[in-house]
Amino acid sequence: SAASDVYKRQELKMLSMKEAIENYVEGCVGKVDCPAYKLFMKAILAGMMIAFGAAGSSVAAHDIVNVGIARLVAGVVFPMGLMMVVMTGAELFTGDCLAIMATVQKKHTALKLIRMLIVVYLGNLLGSLMLTCIDYVSGQYNYSSGILGAYTIKVALGKCNLDFTTALASGILCNILVCAAVM
């Protein structure tokens, strides 16, 4: 039937892990050679998108009394920022760290990788700070009579008070998930 023919044409081929890595490595070659201003703009966008995910998760979870449910809701909403990054092709530092695979395979130099990572890191930082400023000016933190602002400060303080080992381990686990998403 015509409907089954359309379905057959739309089938997606699943890549093996080896094929996925090869595709990613080839994509890294173009990424490290991208002009700095383009990388920077794409990185600003990614920083804003991740900040949108964080802000959305805070809005969704800030007034939920049950801590487990609040964390579940925040955990469901936050990845929307990462999905926006992946779907738009924006540049996120955590995912770009995976470009070291192409460096190891000598597809580009370590200097090009470091340049890209610095540009993307600074762009992500600027993008996230820009969105945070916009959130502040918009009065979003006054939502629920200031409860959202207090919740945001509580989350930030919790992260700032992590000991180095815990923060490092959490960062590594987070980066594994981000790298899996961008592959």
Where are these regions (language model features)?
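Short, small-residue-biased leader/transition segments that mark boundaries at the very start
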Residues: 1-7
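Alpha-helical transmembrane segments and their helix-helix packing motifs
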Residues: 11-183
